Structure formats: C-alpha cells, structure tokens
Amino acid sequence: MKRVSQMTALALALGLACASTWAADMAQALNFKQLAQKQGTAIDTRPSAFYNGWPQSLNGPSGHEPSALNLSARWLDNMSDEQLNAWIQQHQLKSDAPVALYGNDSDVQAVKSRLQKAGLQQVATLSDALQDPARLQRLPHFEQLVYPQWLHDLQQGKEV
C-alpha cells in the first residue's frame, strides 16, 4: 500500500511538472494584438527570402508581419556576440521590452537562445504569426530580387 502511495505521489509530481512547463510555454506566447499593445517587436527567424515576400510553399504565406525585423536563424553561426549586440542596438531593442519570434520551432529556439544570452529578458513566440494574409507585408519589388536558391543553383551549374 505504501508503494502505491509513493507511485501516486510520483505521478502527481510529474504531472504538475509537465503542467507547469506547459503553462510557462503558454505564458511565453503573445498574439499580434497583445504584442502591439505592449509596444513590442516581432522578429521573423525565417530565411530572408521568405521575409522579403517569396512564399515558403505553393500558396503558402508570403511576406512578414507588420514592422517585423528579420533575424534569420541561418545568420547566427556567422554572427559573433558583438555583431548580434550591434544588431540589437541598431534596432533599438531594449532588454525589458517584449520581443516575439516566429518561424519554425528550431529557428525560433535558436534565435531565442542567442537573444536571451545577449540580455533580452522578454522573449516570446508570436502565436498567430503568418495566419492573416491581409496583414502581411512584402518588400517593394521583392519579385525583382534574385532568389538565393536560384542563384546558388546557377552557380552550381544546375538547370534553372
């Protein structure tokens, strides 16, 4: 009987730990309206081509959230801490102001980690990112820009 009680207590403790982790993750998510009300900044962690306006997939979202910055996770390996701090200063991000990231989970996690390491304290995810096509913005004349993958394929001698 004592063993059953111990197992029950362990199961409850694990359940509470999972629930608190889930609650913490939920608390770290903001929707676009909440971010705007808090005067926060959205950051797109996807490759720049998608931020510029190229769709991620056939009939997929095209562009970026209004006033979003682009900090592609692909840049992180090439950015020193000093360069990232300069980027943060250039964009006037404050350590105590909310920042909401969007992109795929691994890109968001990579950027979140580096921004927190750089001292930003309120790093969340943007829960409704790329869900309202009418809200998305594109760089002017983005379609005249050469898509990076096309250029890479051309340089590799592949058919383009």
PLM regions with names:
Residues 3, 19-20:
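Glycine/proline-rich, flexible active-site/cofactor-binding loop segments
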Residues 1-9:
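Bacterial N-terminal signal peptides that target proteins for export
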Residues 21-41, 45-160:
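Rhodanese-like catalytic fold shared by cysteine-dependent sulfurtransferases
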Residues 9-19:
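Bacterial N-terminal signal peptides
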